[in-house]
């Protein structure tokens, strides 16, 4: 998946972009790890509870120039993008709540912003 100026997970109605106020230390504070190439990568499990092993992972990667990003929710193998927004079960609702928690943290710390 190439880097783009805006990104959204499969099925999401909200599009995000890198905030112009982004700081490298803020990325590290929220859990981003700097890769060998200099990019910043965040991987967070979306399991609602430790006992539920859904295997879904939120992946956000920001380019080293802090201008572009990649974003996806992937399954256990880490390759196939998954849509957590189409299922209406209680379990899926808990997964969406955890996803929203992570995204709100990134918005509050000015790592990302919502595109109008």
Where are these regions (language model features)?
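Ser/Thr-rich, low-complexity intrinsically disordered terminal regions
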Residues: 16-17, 21-66, 81
């Amino acid at each position: 998946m190439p880097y783009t100026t805006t990104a959204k997970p499969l099925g999401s109605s909200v599009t995000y972009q890198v905030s112009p106020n982004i700081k490298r230390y803020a990325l590290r504070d929220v859990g981003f790890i700097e890769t060998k190439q200099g990019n910043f990568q965040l991987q967070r499990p979306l399991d609602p509870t430790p006992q539920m092993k859904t295997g879904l992972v939120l992946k956000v990667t920001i380019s080293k120039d802090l201008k572009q990003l990649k974003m996806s929710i992937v399954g256990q193998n880490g390759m196939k993008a998954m849509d957590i927004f189409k299922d209406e079960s209680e379990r899926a609702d808990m997964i969406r709540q955890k996803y929203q928690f992570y995204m709100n943290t990134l918005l509050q710390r000015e790592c990302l912003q919502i595109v109008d």
